[in-house]
Swiss-Prot record:
This is Tellurium resistance protein TerB. Keywords: Plasmid, Tellurium resistance. CDD domains: terB. SUPFAM superfamilies: TerB-like. It comes from Alcaligenes sp. The lineage of its organism: Bacteria, Pseudomonadati, Pseudomonadota, Betaproteobacteria, Burkholderiales.
Length: 122
């Protein structure tokens, strides 16, 4: 009986640690997620428009990325739609809004390059 109590405590601690790690990863990688989604939104709007196929490709990458799979798909889609809507309101506002998130990656060259590759190769 003592062993099962300690197993429960250990399980709770492990679960809490995993959740904390997930939350830290989420905070740490939010800028990368926003930059990647901004590149995807900007290229989608500039090319043939925003189709569900474009969204599926972006979501596929985010789900397969160790750094980004901590984000809820609904949150990513909501952010993508927010950026696309800014283009609908005014083209220059949309460009400025996406560049704000893309330029936030300038201090992380590897992350910036990956965000661009994802957007271009989507």
């Amino acid at each position: 009986m003592r062993m099962s109590f300690f197993d429960k405590v250990k399980g709770a601690l492990t679960s809490g640690r995993e959740e904390l790690t997930r939350q830290v990863g989420r905070y740490k990688n939010k800028k990368f997620m926003q930059g990647t989604v901004a590149v995807c939104a900007r290229i989608a709007v500039a090319s043939d428009g925003v189709s569900s196929e474009e969204k599926q490709k972006m979501i596929g990458f985010l789900r397969s990325s160790e750094e980004l799979k901590v984000f809820d798909t609904a949150e990513v889609i909501e952010f993508f739609n927010k950026l696309v809507t800014s283009f609908d309101f005014d083209l220059e506002i949309g460009k400025g809004e996406t560049m704000k998130y893309i330029l936030a990656l300038k201090d992380q060259p590897e992350a910036a390059q990956l965000a661009l590759r994802v957007g271009i190769c989507r």
